[in-house]
Amino acid sequence: MNRFTPLLLMPFLLVGCATTTPVDIAGSGTQLLARQIQTRQYDTLDKPMTMRSVVATLQDLAFTIDQADAELGTITATRYHQYTMRMTVTVVQRGNERVSVRSNARIGEDAVTDAETYQDFFAVLDKAMFLTLNRVD
């Protein structure tokens, strides 16, 4: 009986070593999923205010604004941390009800494919948009 005890415990030991991995939006095989993770809709028609909120959010996340074009609705920023990340954010008015914000990040020539980067950006932007839309200073 003692010879079989280690064999019985082996599956439990292997399960205990399992780890979770971040969501890789490029490996999912669909551009639709990537677009959903990289895009948020806001119930406002104020594109200039949304652009200001995006700029403030990028600065709060330690990005340096490289270029902003209000007419095109694009903002490009770079963060110099352990690596250089470049993020481009596009703000587009959709219909008569909302504004769409899409972010796209790159490290060097490689697209950032983990969902966490975009979730972190939009978590801060969501708060900034809420405060701005509700006129909280």
Indicate where each model-derived feature is located:
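Bacterial N-terminal signal peptides that target proteins for export
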Residues: 1-7
